[in-house]
């Protein structure tokens, strides 16, 4: 890579020039939300190695929304949220004079949405230099609440940030009524549909999933920022034990994302001209060769099936097309990994297998590296940046996912200088229209009669099987959602027997739909 190759980069080309990650395991003594963003942002600014004080040049501060600030969620944490304008709070904490304050909506796809937005504004000469930060301090927050300690975490600097992203609840009232809200209860529905597609028994699928996630935990074991830096075997991950209880059939605890973490990340993006003016070494420069965001059919109950994702396919196709490379030419990969089915659906759409020699994560994934709420992809991209800085000319792919395999993002990154006019955020409007207008299965909220199980899960509490969730089809193929009777006999039966494609009867009891196996 020559000096001349960097000189061919247009002034308004966006470049990622700094990043930092922080993991705080001090429990109840840990950082609050503002502190954990402030500390990591300071380090990201230092990482740029600017020859001129960078702080004075940051004109935009963007923050990924925190879980405790999630609309539509009634919880102790959301009721205690005390940062009405976190971008301004962060700007003030860092003594910046940023004129643009941006806050994202809910979703694990938010970091890619933010990068796309910031990159386009740099390209259009609307902004010059942006700081993007995100993370969680839930371990400290929840720990203090449980111990009865004060949580006076608040700062109100005035003003309202600009909101970017789609702010719509991930489920409708009918889905929520039947238990489709907590991700740990929804992603297992995709898992059982996947094993039906692959012709796997429950045990075979759990073993296959254990092998997939053993590879992830191995990466996490070598990551100094990982919340759980432990290499677990496939057997450890798949085997149900008191310390690894079933959460939602077929997923054990070790297959679930861990969100109660204190982790944060910050990334600095600016125009190539600004990077040159500030004397930032070209060895720090990483280019976003393409970025794309697109949604699947919004509601889970309306999906065509539960083993594929038209949006992931279109999203990743679009970033490869814009970057003018194929998946085979990517050297580093990070697939969003909140639950195994999120990875497996993406693998299917990208034609990847679990033993790909490149690996499918650069961090270790959300169950092992940690799942800092909506901000995880910040960490995967920061990790990707560092790998690419040490691998001149190589490419990396990072994917993102919000809600329930609902909202998707993808980005391709490289240290290879981008030459020519930068216009690398995909226009997905036509693709989105095609997905939204697809023929959805007929659905009824009040099913009655004979039926067949399309997919299902048994949600477990610490005391054992607690609730059955069934998505099924009536004889005329009309889809429905139902619960099962909460008797121990029924729940134990459903926990032991493979219920896929089995028959039963469904009816409405006046409150919700109830499925009874034959």
Predicted regions and their residues:
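Condensing-enzyme catalytic core mediating Claisen C-C bond formation in acyl metabolism
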Residues: 2-37, 156-181, 187-215, 247-307, ...
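Conserved catalytic cysteine-centered active-site region
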Residues: 10, 25, 65, 69-129, ...
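Short, well-ordered amphipathic alpha-helical segments that serve as non-catalytic structural scaffolds
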Residues: 34-52, 86-87, 307-323, 380-384
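Phosphate/pyrophosphate-binding loops at sites that engage ATP/ADP/AMP, CoA/4′-phosphopantetheine
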Residues: 43-59, 94, 316-329, 353, ...
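Beta-strand segments within the central parallel beta-sheet cores of soluble alpha/beta enzyme folds
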Residues: 54-65, 100-106, 131-134, 204-212, ...
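Active-site-proximal alpha-helical scaffold in enzymes
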Residues: 105-136, 181-222, 267-274, 322-325, ...
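Accessory "access/gating" subregions that flank catalytic or transport cores
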Residues: 222-282, 321, 328-348
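Short nucleic-acid-contacting surface segments enriched for D/E, G, S/T with interspersed K/R
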Residues: 489-507
């Amino acid at each position: 890579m020559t000096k001349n190759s960097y000189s061919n980069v247009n002034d308004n080309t966006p470049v990622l020039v700094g990043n930092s990650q922080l993991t705080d395991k001090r429990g109840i003594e840990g950082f609050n939300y503002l502190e954990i963003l402030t500390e990591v942002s300071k380090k990201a600014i230092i990482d740029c190695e600017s020859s001129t004080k960078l702080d004075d040049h940051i004109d935009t501060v963007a923050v990924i929304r925190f879980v405790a600030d999630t609309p539509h969620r009634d919880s102790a944490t959301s009721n205690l949220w005390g940062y009405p304008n976190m971008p301004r709070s962060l700007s003030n904490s860092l003594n910046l004079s940023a004129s643009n304050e941006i806050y994202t909506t809910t979703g694990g796809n938010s970091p890619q949405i933010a990068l796309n937005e910031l990159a386009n504004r740099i390209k259009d000469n609307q902004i010059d230099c942006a700081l993007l930060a995100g993370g969680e301090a839930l371990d400290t927050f929840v720990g203090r609440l449980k111990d009865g300690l004060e949580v006076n975490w608040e700062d109100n600097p005035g003003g309202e940030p600009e909101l970017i992203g789609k702010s719509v609840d991930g489920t409708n009232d009918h889905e929520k009524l039947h238990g489709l809200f907590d991700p740990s209860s929804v992603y297992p529905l995709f898992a059982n549909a996947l094993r039906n597609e692959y012709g796997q028994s429950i045990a075979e699928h759990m073993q296959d999933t254990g092998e997939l996630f053993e590879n992830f935990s191995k990466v996490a074991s070598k990551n100094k920022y990982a919340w759980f830096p432990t290499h677990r075997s496939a057997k450890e991950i798949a085997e149900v034990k008191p310390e690894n209880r079933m959460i939602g059939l077929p997923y054990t605890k070790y297959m679930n994302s861990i969100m109660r973490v204190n982790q944060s990340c910050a990334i600095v993006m600016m125009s190539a001209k600004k990077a040159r003016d500030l004397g930032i070494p070209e060895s720090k420069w990483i280019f976003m060769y393409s970025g794309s965001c697109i949604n699947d059919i919004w509601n889970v109950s309306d999906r065509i099936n539960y083993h594929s994702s038209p949006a992931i396919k279109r999203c990743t196709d679009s970033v490869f097309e814009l970057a003018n490379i194929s998946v085979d030419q990517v050297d580093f990969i990070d697939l969003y990994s909140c639950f195994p089915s999120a990875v497996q659906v993406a693998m299917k759409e990208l034609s990847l297998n679990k033993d790909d020699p490149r690996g499918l994560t650069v961090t270790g994934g959300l169950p092992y590296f940690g799942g800092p709420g909506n901000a995880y992809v910040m960490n995967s991209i920061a990790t990707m940046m560092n790998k690419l800085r040490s691998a001149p000319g190589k490419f990396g792919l990072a994917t993102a996912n919000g809600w329930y395999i609902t909202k998707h993002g993808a980005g391709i990154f490289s240290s290879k200088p981008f030459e020519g006019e930068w216009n690398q955020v995909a226009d997905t409007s036509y693709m989105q229209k095609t997905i939204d207008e697809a023929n959805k299965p007929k659905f009824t909220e009040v099913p009655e009669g004979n039926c067949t199980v399309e997919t299902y899960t048994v949600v477990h509490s610490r005391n054992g099987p607690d609730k059955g969730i069934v998505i099924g089809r009536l004889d005329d193929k009309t889809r429905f959602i139902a619960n099962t009777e909460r008797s121990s006999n029924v729940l134990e039966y459903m926990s032991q027997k493979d219920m896929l494609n089995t028959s039963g009867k469904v009816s409405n009891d006046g409150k919700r739909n109830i499925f009874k196996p034959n």
